[in-house]
Amino acid sequence: LYRIVPDPETAEQVAALPVDALLDYAQVLTVLEVSPWAGSPQNDANPHGAVRRWAFGPGMAGQVVYLVLEAQREVHLLMVQWIG
C-alpha cells in the first residue's frame, strides 16, 4: 500500500467540498492507496510523470492533484479542487 500524505492546504480544500462529493473523494483516496499510477498525468506531454490527477464527484467536477513518490511508497496530495 501507498501512504497518503496530505499537504496542509488540502484539509481546507476538502472541507470546502460539497457533501455529495465526499464519498467519491474518499473512494479516490482508497484507490490511490493501491494504484496511484492509474490516475491521468497532470502534464499530457509527460505521460510517465509523477504528478497525476484524478477526477471525481458528480459530473467529475472534482479533481485531486497528487505526487507519487515510488521509492517511499507515498502519495502526496497537492490540491483538491471543486469546479461545480
Question: Which sequence ranges carry the predicted segments?
Answer:
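Basic, Lys/Arg-enriched alpha-helical interface segments
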Residues: L1-A61, V68-G84
